[in-house]
């Protein structure tokens, strides 16, 4: 019985403490306006949980900064979008996270909204494989 209790506590600890911010593979839809369709590519981005709290008493002298799982370092990769018209620029550059951390969301480079469009959104409605 003690083994079962230990296993249960270990699983709870693992779920709470170890689901930290880390690199994960995702599929995103990329689109070029000149090409009029989207393609899916695989990339690496940050996902996970960060310790945060929402204070009951909001102290205006001390801002409450919520930490999110975001990139610490990233690189850019470029792909050629196949099937574009010959006169169109068919190169697309996208970010690839190489290191993650829990930090303040930088709205200059990241969608910090509660509900963004999502990585598979395509404004043209047509996905090419």
Swiss-Prot record:
Belongs to the glycoprotein hormones subunit beta family. Together with the alpha chain CGA constitutes follitropin, the follicle-stimulating hormone, and provides its biological specificity to the hormone heterodimer. Binds FSHR, a G protein-coupled receptor, on target cells to activate downstream signaling pathways. Follitropin is involved in follicle development and spermatogenesis in reproductive organs. SUPFAM superfamilies: Cystine-knot cytokines. It comes from the Eukaryota. Heterodimer. The active follitropin is a heterodimer composed of an alpha chain/CGA shared with other hormones and a unique beta chain/FSHB shown here. The keyword Disulfide bond applies. CDD domains: GHB_like. Disulfide bonds join 21-69, 35-84, 38-122, 46-100, 50-102, 105-112. Residues 1-20 form the signal peptide. It comes from Gorilla gorilla gorilla (Western lowland gorilla). Its main location: secreted. Keywords: Disulfide bond, Glycoprotein, Hormone, Secreted, Signal. It is found in: Secreted. GO terms for biological process: follicle-stimulating hormone signaling pathway; G protein-coupled receptor signaling pathway; regulation of signaling receptor activity. GO terms for molecular function: follicle-stimulating hormone activity. Glycans are attached at residues 25, 42. GO terms for cellular component: cytoplasm; extracellular space; follicle-stimulating hormone complex. Transmembrane segments: none annotated. This is Follitropin subunit beta. Coiled coil: none annotated.
